[in-house]
Design a protein with these regions (language model features):
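Internal, well-ordered alpha-helical segments in soluble enzyme and binding-protein domains
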Residues: 8, 31, 136-140, 174
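Short secondary-structure boundary segments
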Residues: 50, 76, 120, 158-160, ...
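Charged helix-capping and loop-helix junction motifs
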Residues: 63, 132-138
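N-terminal active-site beta-alpha-beta segment that forms phosphate/nucleotide-binding
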Residues: 1-96, 101-104, 108-111
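Surface-exposed, charge/polar-rich loops and edge strands
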Residues: 1-3, 17, 108-116, 125-128, ...
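Short, well-ordered alpha-helical microsegments
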Residues: 55-58, 137, 163
Length: 188
């Protein structure tokens, strides 16, 4: 049976709400190993997200990354629903956005990251993803990949969010990697 994105989004959001609290441990060392492999010892800028709606909680990873002197940025949705990344230190206050997500101050410095961590609603083994349906990450990744050729995109999901096939359109941006509690999905 073939599903459209709307149906898949609804199904996997429900699954995530139901099962996410059962997953106890994520091994974020895998991301640090990827960073070392891709960027050597360069102190890169990492774009994370503040988890909501049962997304994978990456806060311990962001805190560890900050302690290792990586710059941390979080997404901010601005004028015309354009997504940028603003600097954020772990203990700085965050503010509720128009979409109910937490963001750094809009006056914080805008930085283009080297590695972008993307929350996922669903994914397939071909590194396709479904998000919340607004296209923020797809548009943003398209734009940044033209500016920074070696940008690395990493999806974060639970293994139960895997879908046999994700329907794709010309606007969808394929990820470089997907991390789950069971390991890493790499390009074939």
């Amino acid at each position: 049976m073939k599903y459209d994105k709307f149906s898949l989004r609804k199904k996997y959001l429900s699954k995530r709400k139901k099962y996410s609290l059962r997953v106890k441990k994520f091994n974020f060392d895998m991301i640090f190993k990827l960073i070392k492999k891709k960027f050597s010892n360069k102190k890169i800028t990492i774009a994370g997200y503040y988890p909501s709606n049962y997304e994978v909680n990456i806060l311990s990873f962001l805190k560890s990354a900050e302690k290792k002197n990586f710059k941390i940025v979080l997404p901010v949705i601005g004028v015309s629903n354009k997504m940028t990344y603003k600097s954020w230190a772990f203990m700085e206050p965050l503010y509720v956005s128009q979409f109910g997500t937490l963001e750094p101050k809009k006056t914080n410095k805008e930085i283009i990251p080297d590695l972008i961590i993307v929350p996922l609603v669903a994914y397939d083994h071909n590194l396709n993803r479904i998000g919340y349906g607004k296209g923020f990450y797809d548009r943003n990744l398209q734009k940044i990949s033209k500016i920074k050729k070696n940008i690395v995109s990493v999806g974060m999901a639970y293994s139960f969010q895997e879908c046999p096939t994700i329907p794709i359109s010309k606007y969808d941006f394929k990820l470089n990697y997907i991390f789950t509690e069971q390991g890493i999905i790499k390009p074939n």
